């Protein structure tokens, strides 16, 4: 399935991207079964968008629960997090 995650960042997009693309964090996502198809920043509404392919929403929920420290380091404002699961 495809999931679109959208959120605001507290430390800026470039900082978020640096943490998100860190080799160890990329490996954690791969091991969890999360494949990132695209990512980007919409300056007009100040939101980051990440398009992911995964088996189920449970996969991303478990991955996020296990990586809360890294998510906080990246500056993700969890109060703005939106997940949109797309089913074919």
Placement of each model-derived feature along the sequence:
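Short S/T/G/P-rich N-terminal loop/turn motif that feeds into the first structured element of a domain
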Residues: 1-88
């Amino acid at each position: 399935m495809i999931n679109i995650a959208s959120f605001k960042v507290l430390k800026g997009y470039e900082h978020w991207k640096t943490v998100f693309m860190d080799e160890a964090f990329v490996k954690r996502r791969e091991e969890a079964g999360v494949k990132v198809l695209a990512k980007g920043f919409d300056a007009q509404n100040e939101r980051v968008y990440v398009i992911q392919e995964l088996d189920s929403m449970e996969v991303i929920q478990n991955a996020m629960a296990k990586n809360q420290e890294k998510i906080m380091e990246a500056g993700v404002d969890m109060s703005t997090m939106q997940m949109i699961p797309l089913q074919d």
